[in-house]
A protein has these predicted regions:
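C-terminal scaffold of the Radical SAM
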Residues: 34, 58-77, 88-349
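Basic, amphipathic "hinge/linker" alpha-helix immediately C-terminal to the N-terminal HTH DNA-binding motif
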Residues: 321, 375-382
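Short, amphipathic alpha-helical interaction segments positioned at domain boundaries
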Residues: 382-415
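Flexible, acidic/Gly-rich N-terminal and inter-domain linker regions that tether
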Residues: 1-35, 45, 83-84, 365, ...
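Short amphipathic alpha-helical interaction segments
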Residues: 349-363
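A short, conserved structural fragment
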Residues: 363-373
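Canonical Radical SAM [4Fe-4S] cluster-binding loop centered on the CxxxCxxC motif
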Residues: 31-68
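Short beta-strand motif preference
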Residues: 37-39, 148, 377
Length: 415
């Protein structure tokens, strides 16, 4: 109800987000500035009960067939424009992309036939992947940024999450032996019985191990996962988030996004804050000026579509102008700041003309501050953004991903 009312208010319409079983064979990305790239590799050695992302158990044969299809999808999209398109960054997610480490260079080479990457190449890794051999392979392939899914260094939380422990000494040794431009370590907060002391210990250990930045993601209980962990209460969650935020800021960190804190000012790492992006692989999403599309979650159906030289799109949303504005603002807010000049450059209309009332309310309620024309979230605003994002995730992402896990190509979905 909260997300539905918010959508109607901000879009000035009762029209829902309507996703249909349709797609454009040719994607209109040639004139998209600030374009990012995402590649999804869904294979895992074992399945974590809390993880909501598209994944499947690894087999060498299935992974090989999938990578072959993935490279063909890259060429299918990339060959639609003449010359090479300048893009910001490339990010590999999963799953466990390191299970395809020996073919990462092949994928990057295919992408570089069509795109010029200007802000580096990142990959997410399981702690078990942090070995000198794997890191050497990835660095030689062109990877410059790592995102390591630690979740927690503490055994009690590792057991809750069904994870094996990260060997701190081995982790530090491997990262020291094979350095990267950026090493982000990801943690989950708001786990059952988790205290500020627990979270502080994880953050301190991460920085000591060479992480910069550190990312703190809230635990969300998706309906379609096998997780049985209870959610933390709102007051406890806010207290924990405020405490760890103050601690990070007081110890000299900068807040580079809603989730991330960095010791070095420019050590940002995010796959989220892109104005437009192209996604390759099963479950990968694409966001362009007037549409959002998401690929099928089925590995076999994905390969079948690519074999037919067709886009593997499962659902497409055609934005109204205000829907696109809200989508832009929601994801831009992850950086904790919104610059009206960027909004006007993207949409050709002043932000205050479209959402002047909402901006005034945000300031009056203490959610945001304005300085030099730029709006920045306060500590209070950041918490309520987290809080609202939980509703958004369960109302939108949970429903969509839950459906796509069951049906390769649904007829439509209203959100």
């Amino acid at each position: 109800m909260i997300t539905e009312l918010t959508r109607m208010w901000l879009t000035r319409s009762t029209k829902p987000f309507l996703f249909k079983k349709e797609y454009d064979q040719e994607l209109p990305f040639s004139d998209c500035d600030g374009l990012g790239l995402y590649v999804h590799i869904p294979f895992c050695r074992s399945i974590c009960s809390f993880c909501p992302y598209c994944k499947t158990l690894y087999s060498e044969e299935a992974c090989s067939r999938y990578i072959d299809a993935l490279i063909r999808e890259i060429h299918l999209a990339g060959s639609q424009i003449p010359g090479k398109k300048i893009v910001t960054s490339l990010y590999f997610g999963g799953g466990t992309p390191a299970l395809a480490a020996d073919r990462i260079k092949e994928i990057i080479d295919a992408i570089q036939e069509h795109f010029i990457i200007t802000q580096g190449i990142g990959i997410e890794l399981h702690p078990e992947n942090i070995t000198p051999r794997t890191l050497h392979i990835l660095k030689e392939a062109g990877i410059t940024k790592l995102s390591i899914g630690i979740q927690s260094f503490q055994e009690k939380f590792q057991k809750l999450l069904g994870r094996t422990g990260a060997d701190m000494d081995s982790l530090k040794a491997a990262l020291s032996q094979v350095p990267f431009e950026t090493v982000s370590m990801d943690f989950i907060f708001a786990l059952p019985s988790q205290t500020f002391g627990d979270l502080k210990a994880d953050v301190d250990a991460a920085f000591e191990a060479g992480a910069n930045p550190v990312a703190l993601y809230p635990f969300i209980d998706f309906t379609f996962t096998d997780s049985v962990l209870p959610s933390m209460g709102k007051k406890e969650k806010r207290r924990l988030l405020d405490q760890i935020t103050r601690y990070c800021l007081e110890t000299g960190c900068t807040r580079s996004s809603i989730w991330t804190f960095a010791r070095e000012k420019h050590a940002s790492y995010s796959s989220m804050t892109r104005d437009n992006f192209l996604g390759f692989g099963c479950s990968a999403a694409t966001l362009l000026r007037d549409q959002f599309k998401i690929n099928t979650f089925s590995v076999e159906e994905y390969i079948r579509r690519i074999d037919q030289k067709k886009m593997p799109t499962a659902l497409t949303l055609r934005f109204t102008p205000r829907q696109r504005m809200i989508y832009y603002l929601f994801w831009t807010a992850y950086s904790t700041r919104v610059d009206p000049r960027d909004f006007e450059a993207f949409f050709g209309v002043p932000l205050k003309k479209m959402y002047g009332l909402e901006l005034r309310l945000a300031r009056l309620l203490g959610f945001a501050e304005e300085k030099d024309g730029v709006y920045s979230m306060t500590l209070k605003g950041a918490f309520y953004y987290h809080y609202y994002e939980n509703f958004y995730t369960l109302s939108y992402i949970d429903r969509m991903w839950g459906l796509l896990r069951k049906e390769a190509f649904p007829e439509q979905m209203e959100l």
